[in-house]
Amino acid sequence: MIAIVDYGVGNLFSLSSSLKALGLEAEITRAPSRLRAADRIILPGVGAFGDARRKLDDTGLVPVIQEEAQRKPLLGICLGMQLLFDRSFEYGEHAGLGLIPGEVADLRDDLTDKTLKVLHMGWNSLQIVRDDPLFQYFKDGEYVYYVHSFYARNCADSILGTSQYGNVAVTGAVRNGNVYGTQFHPEKSGDAGLRLLKAFSEL
C-alpha cells in the first residue's frame, strides 16, 4: 500500500487517482499507524512552505515521516519535495524535515533574465543527471509539468534530474537514500509521469 500524507495541502485525489489507474493500492491518510503499515509514502504539497510546515506539524506526523523514511521509500512532490530539505527562504526562513541536505530559494535570486516570469509553470524537459531506478521507465528529455516559483539548491549530491529555466538548472528530481523528490507533478505529467510513479511503486 502507498500512503498519501493528508495534511490539508495538495491535490490528493488527483494523485490517488493516478496511482489507482496504475492498479496500485493507495490510501489518503493522516494516521501514524497507516504510515507505518505502508510499503511506501508520498508527501504531496502545493502553496507556501511555512504554512505547509505548520499544517504538517499540527498533524503530529513529522517524527513519524522522519522515522519511516529510514525504512521505506518516500516521495515528496512539488512543495512536498521542498519540505524534505533543511530549510526554505520563502517569506522568511523555515525549517524543513532535514531528510535531504540543501535549501529552498526564490528563483528570482538566481535568474539573470529578469524578463522571465518568476512562476515556472508548464511543460519542461527533464534531463537525467544520474541514473536511478526511479527512471527505469523514463527517457532522458521527456517533458514533465511544473508549477513553482521556489526551487531546491545547494543539493548537488542528491540531484537526479534538472530542467533548464533561463540560466537556472532547476532541480527537478532528487534522492538521498530512501528519500526521493520531484519538483514537477508526476500526476499531471501524462504518460511519462505515470511511468515514474510506477517505478516508485517498485522501489
Predicted regions and their residues:
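Short acidic/histidine-rich motifs immediately flanking catalytic phosphotransfer sites
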Residues: 36-45
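Short acidic low-complexity segments
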Residues: 26-37
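Short gly/ser/thr-rich secondary-structure transition/capping motifs
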Residues: 21-28, 56-59, 125-129, 163-165
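Structural alpha-helical scaffold elements that stabilize or flank donor/cofactor-binding regions
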Residues: 34-35, 68, 173
